[in-house]
Amino acid sequence: MTQSVVQALSAFSQRFLQHCAQQTGQLPENDELLGLASPCVVEELTDVVRWRPVNREVWADFSNVERAIELTLHEDIKAFYASQFSADMPAQWRGRELTLLQVWSEDDFTRLQENILGHLVMQRRLKQKPTVFIATTEDEMAVVSVCNLSGNVILEKLGTAQREVLTADLETFLEQLEPKVN
């Protein structure tokens, strides 16, 4: 499944680039990432950075997170975050607006690992099944996550047991995503 997740993420990234080109005539732009180093940066303007996703030559390693929480992360989660650098990408899944989270740089990967660890520690304290977030939603208390046990993609309400299965796996979810330009 890991390689198929990488292919589905890459395919979505290409759809996102094409959608941006069709809507704006150029590469995606982001004002929040201006001045932050990344292999994704194509051009820095006065108020925005233009960027494109870049495949990692060497996949990122999650072993320190796994050791710290004494839990092996689902291979799809590792493939999703370890295979490319990219800015977050706005999208829709069956009419639901979301932002697909990505890793901008090595520094950003360190921050992501800290956030994943904090999320898993919170879930452990609440005696919930472990998940790892992959997207934010308009509701700041709801995130799209991958269940670490089943690989299901779910919509979960943070700090509660409220979960809704969206797809059986991450590959299917990524294939069904539609890019959106904000």
Swiss-Prot record:
Q: Which GO terms describe its cellular component?
A: cytoplasmic side of plasma membrane
Query: Which Gene3D superfamilies does the entry mention?
Result: Syd protein
Q: Does the keyword Cell membrane apply?
A: yes
Protein name (record)? Protein Syd
NCBIfam families listed in its UniProt record: PRK04968.1
Q: Which UniProt keywords apply?
A: Cell inner membrane, Cell membrane, Membrane
* Organism annotation: Vibrio cholerae serotype O1 (strain ATCC 39315 / El Tor Inaba N16961)
Which InterPro entries does this UniProt record tie to the protein?
A: Syd, Syd_sf
Q: Which Pfam families match?
A: Syd
Membrane topology note: Peripheral membrane protein
Which family is it part of? Answer: Belongs to the Syd family.
Localization per Swiss-Prot or TrEMBL: Cell inner membrane
- Asked if the keyword Cell inner membrane belongs to this entry, the reply reads yes
Coiled-coil residue windows: none
Question: What job does the chain carry out?
Answer: Interacts with the SecY protein in vivo. May bind preferentially to an uncomplexed state of SecY, thus functioning either as a chelating agent for excess SecY in the cell or as a regulatory factor that negatively controls the translocase function.
Q: Which gene encodes it?
A: syd
